[in-house]
Amino acid sequence: MPSLPAPPAPRLLLGLLLLGSRPAGGTGPEAPALPIRSEKEPLPVRGAAGCSFGGKVYALDETWHPDLGEPFGVMRCVLCACEAPQWARRGRGPGRVSCKNIKPQCPTLACRQPRQLPGHCCQTCPQDAERSNLDPQPAGLVFEYPRDPEHRSYSDRGEPGTGERTRGDGHTEDFVALLTGPRTQAVARARVSLLRSSLRFSISYQRLDRPSRVRFTDPTGNILFEHPAAPTQDGLVCGVWRAVPRLSVRLLRAEQLRVALVTPTHPSEEVWGPLIWQGALTAETFSAILTLEDPLQRGVGGIALLTLSDTEDALHFLLLFRGLLGGLAHVPLKLQILHQGQLLRELQANASAQEPGFAEVLPSLTDQEMDWLVLGELQMVLEKMGGPELRISGYITTRQSCDVLQSVLCGADALIPVQTGAAGSASFILLGNGSLIYQVQVIGTGSEVVAMTLETKPQRKNQRTVLCHMAGLQLGGHMAVGVCSGLGARGAHMLLQNELFLNIGTKDFPDGELRGHVTALCYSGHSAHYDRLPVPLAGALVLPPVRSQAAGHAWLSLDTHCHLHYEVLLAGLGGSEQGTVTAHLLGPPGMPGPQRLLKGFYGSEAQGVVKDLEPVLLRHLTQGTASLLITTKSNPRGELRGQVHIASQCEVGGLRLASEGVRMSLAPNGEAATSPMLPAGPGPEAPVPAKHGSSGRPRDPNTCFFEGQQRPHGARWAPNYDPLCSLCTCQRRTVICDPVVCPPPSCPHPVQALDQCCPVCPEKQRSRDLPSLPNLEPGEGCYFDGDRSWRAAGTRWHPVVPPFGLIKCAVCTCKGATGEVHCEKVQCPRLACAQPVRANPTDCCKQCPVGSGTHAKLGDPMQADGPRGCRFAGQWFPENQSWHPSVPPFGEMSCITCRCGAGVPHCERDDCSPPLSCGSGKESRCCSHCTAQRSSETRTLPELEKEAQRS
């Protein structure tokens, strides 16, 4: 079905029209249900009950008539139902949508002139109209649906469905995988989080050489995605799979997606395992990887997910293992908890092939055991009882993750909210021994900071549990750096459960001028979180200062191609300001210059990449004179501001941007530093070993390898196999090569130069199409932003626009006088033949074949400069022509009229108003008209009422 303005899903539309257009012919065999599915239906969430259909979520056993929008409206002769599958438990699990045509179920009527009442599928006799809602209509057909296109379905009236919540509030789905291999003792554990359309993974491993790649495959081994594994410390690999295809998401939710680690010694995968959903992941705060103790054994390993009870010192855990069963159906196991070889706890369990794992509780941990737990000194040993000795063991540590612990401190979140314009920014690292490293920046307080505490949420007023008293400010009074070593197991558990707060008290506000919630920020794929501090954003830094109760911080970095990566977090904004937040990158306040809007705000968070940053802003960034300005509806000139300094040596346009120093510190005025002051953490973009003679610069995972050379993402070059007449581009690890297409020369006798692909006119021979002319004077050439290249004055070319490649239906010209690039669409000539063809597949315009007829016909509608016409159901209709759409095999839809306007088809249902005042009518195409004969059984209800009153 063609695209229409209103219907949301063309395939759904066509399928339902095929069902609803059958002629009414009394009863008959029930039509088989067609597999109707919406193209844009939300993906079902694992474990959610109900069905998703047409962009809405329906409960189990709910029935509805699909609404196709205008002009088709609700298909009342089609009934859909959400059915529970037979294998699912009652009220649980995703349902199955079944739709069928219920027109054949309409009863046969005795009257000669049945009527069609609005909101009904079946016709009724006039004398039964008053009790039509009691007649034996097919189930589900008595509902009256409004025609208002903004009406809400039944599933929208209450709480939104699970699938809608998943995409509306940034809900994260977590999965875990145990990775082992038959020829190795290595064991790895992968934790994967699906957030919107990105898959963020943290993989920890033991007894494994540094992995080279992370690989995701389907059940048959087909590679779906690969990510370079940057060298990291502590056996941790981080990465992001962006824009995950829907099929891969379905495989993940069906637990059919497999993750593997590739090493130089095992290029075909050393360890692998399927990703499974585990509810215990949301509560996990401690973990363990269990490896073999016998150096001669292979292919066995396990992982443990542990958490503390919220009400007592009990350790709950889930243990997953592979290779212990040895092909047996049931195996008894023994679990021991050791400290320096001394047995502390022991329990027994049974494992089966169907459930290779078990859950247990270690109750009533002593204070000493709690201390050993947070210090990472408790060892977990799992042993197979009976048969050959088989033991795996590992130490319990705090959960490892690529996420970043951080906090934005603002006055709005203080125990007694204040509005001073001050702001705070904090970053944390939790070490394996339970120690917490903190770095806190404070900006804009009106008085001296007297206390900085890490504490729990107060249960009552003035009843706060302080876990750590932090050191005072240093480095000019704007920063505090230190270590909290006394959190304990309970404190570490609460920290990883996002249950702690950072409070800053000043002389003017001893109970707290700034306060922030310590939370884990999802890994975003770049190393800025680990090697530099965030930029604090405060109202006090706005000129003039703003006494805002909000605050924020931002991570910004430049990669080797001068692409700006940013991530902004805000706190303390009112609900009315949430949808009005914008962020701009600009130069010094009060100075004219370019500004760049940073897009991507999702609530109070924003992240993205700017790939074409202006050179002026790049210089401001490297010189430390750039500003990040946050504006809101109440403060359109600036709610928050931060000063940005990024030490970078990236290259843009053949020029190297180098700052004075690579390692900077926080300035006394609160400017954000870019030095790697945080302890070495898992760097997601760390470089792979560089080749001899290289600069050792980090390798972008999007680079391309072609003809023995590495090419960065976005690079353009002439390939060795055809250096004159081909052009290649690198687009995210994919090389696209296009032949150079020469436009027709504007002179009768062009000249072919030896060093050029296209012939040029003699007077313009000196104007060469060079890939880069950085030293051109004004008026000598043009810079084309599409492929980022300089062109000589007077040059004409077909543009190359990444990632689309060569655009042959456009010609660009460099106007030397002004330095402007003028691009226009290729004007295809009108053709008189009936079947034009393209002589070459790469041609833009069609031609008449040799020997073709001369039947008059419009030129290619896509290239014509006149009215374009409309394509509808595979046919072209001229501008302003109207028609009734045809739906095979049922023929013309006489009740719907379509018209072509401005190249877009518009369809609407014919209006049959005003209603007939005569009693009998005759169907004429769509609407009825009065006839001469009338009978009592065909008179309208108002006429019958008037006749009764007269009598």
UniProtKB/Swiss-Prot annotation:
<dbReference type="GO" id="GO:0021513">
    <property type="term" value="P:spinal cord dorsal/ventral patterning"/>
</dbReference>
<dbReference type="GO" id="GO:0005615">
    <property type="term" value="C:extracellular space"/>
</dbReference>
<dbReference type="GO" id="GO:1990926">
    <property type="term" value="P:short-term synaptic potentiation"/>
</dbReference>
<dbReference type="InterPro" id="IPR052278">
    <property type="entry name" value="Chordin-like_regulators"/>
</dbReference>
<dbReference type="InterPro" id="IPR001007">
    <property type="entry name" value="VWF_dom"/>
</dbReference>
<feature type="domain" description="CHRD 2">
    <location>
        <begin position="282"/>
        <end position="401"/>
    </location>
</feature>
<comment type="function">
    <text>Dorsalizing factor. Key developmental protein that dorsalizes early vertebrate embryonic tissues by binding to ventralizing TGF-beta family bone morphogenetic proteins (BMPs) and sequestering them in latent complexes.</text>
</comment>
<dbReference type="GO" id="GO:0045545">
    <property type="term" value="F:syndecan binding"/>
</dbReference>
<dbReference type="GO" id="GO:0007417">
    <property type="term" value="P:central nervous system development"/>
</dbReference>
<protein>
    <recommendedName>
        <fullName>Chordin</fullName>
    </recommendedName>
</protein>
<dbReference type="GO" id="GO:0030336">
    <property type="term" value="P:negative regulation of cell migration"/>
</dbReference>
<dbReference type="GO" id="GO:0035906">
    <property type="term" value="P:descending aorta development"/>
</dbReference>
<dbReference type="GO" id="GO:0010467">
    <property type="term" value="P:gene expression"/>
</dbReference>
<dbReference type="GO" id="GO:1904888">
    <property type="term" value="P:cranial skeletal system development"/>
</dbReference>
<dbReference type="GO" id="GO:0036122">
    <property type="term" value="F:BMP binding"/>
</dbReference>
<dbReference type="Pfam" id="PF07452">
    <property type="entry name" value="CHRD"/>
</dbReference>
<dbReference type="GO" id="GO:0007389">
    <property type="term" value="P:pattern specification process"/>
</dbReference>
<dbReference type="GO" id="GO:0045668">
    <property type="term" value="P:negative regulation of osteoblast differentiation"/>
</dbReference>
<dbReference type="GO" id="GO:0017038">
    <property type="term" value="P:protein import"/>
</dbReference>
<dbReference type="GO" id="GO:0005576">
    <property type="term" value="C:extracellular region"/>
</dbReference>
<dbReference type="GO" id="GO:0160093">
    <property type="term" value="P:chordate pharynx development"/>
</dbReference>
<dbReference type="GO" id="GO:0045185">
    <property type="term" value="P:maintenance of protein location"/>
</dbReference>
<feature type="signal peptide">
    <location>
        <begin position="1"/>
        <end position="26"/>
    </location>
</feature>
<dbReference type="GO" id="GO:0001701">
    <property type="term" value="P:in utero embryonic development"/>
</dbReference>
<dbReference type="GO" id="GO:0098793">
    <property type="term" value="C:presynapse"/>
</dbReference>
<dbReference type="GO" id="GO:0043395">
    <property type="term" value="F:heparan sulfate proteoglycan binding"/>
</dbReference>
<dbReference type="GO" id="GO:0030509">
    <property type="term" value="P:BMP signaling pathway"/>
</dbReference>
<comment type="subunit">
    <text>Interacts with TWSG1 and/or BMP4.</text>
</comment>
<feature type="compositionally biased region" description="Basic and acidic residues">
    <location>
        <begin position="145"/>
        <end position="170"/>
    </location>
</feature>
<feature type="glycosylation site" description="N-linked (GlcNAc...) asparagine">
    <location>
        <position position="350"/>
    </location>
</feature>
<feature type="region of interest" description="Disordered">
    <location>
        <begin position="144"/>
        <end position="170"/>
    </location>
</feature>
<dbReference type="GO" id="GO:0035050">
    <property type="term" value="P:embryonic heart tube development"/>
</dbReference>
<dbReference type="GO" id="GO:0008543">
    <property type="term" value="P:fibroblast growth factor receptor signaling pathway"/>
</dbReference>
<dbReference type="InterPro" id="IPR010895">
    <property type="entry name" value="CHRD"/>
</dbReference>
<keyword id="KW-0964">Secreted</keyword>
<feature type="domain" description="CHRD 1">
    <location>
        <begin position="171"/>
        <end position="280"/>
    </location>
</feature>
<feature type="glycosylation site" description="N-linked (GlcNAc...) asparagine">
    <location>
        <position position="433"/>
    </location>
</feature>
<comment type="similarity">
    <text>Belongs to the chordin family.</text>
</comment>
<dbReference type="GO" id="GO:0048168">
    <property type="term" value="P:regulation of neuronal synaptic plasticity"/>
</dbReference>
<keyword id="KW-0677">Repeat</keyword>
<feature type="region of interest" description="Disordered">
    <location>
        <begin position="669"/>
        <end position="701"/>
    </location>
</feature>
<feature type="compositionally biased region" description="Basic and acidic residues">
    <location>
        <begin position="936"/>
        <end position="951"/>
    </location>
</feature>
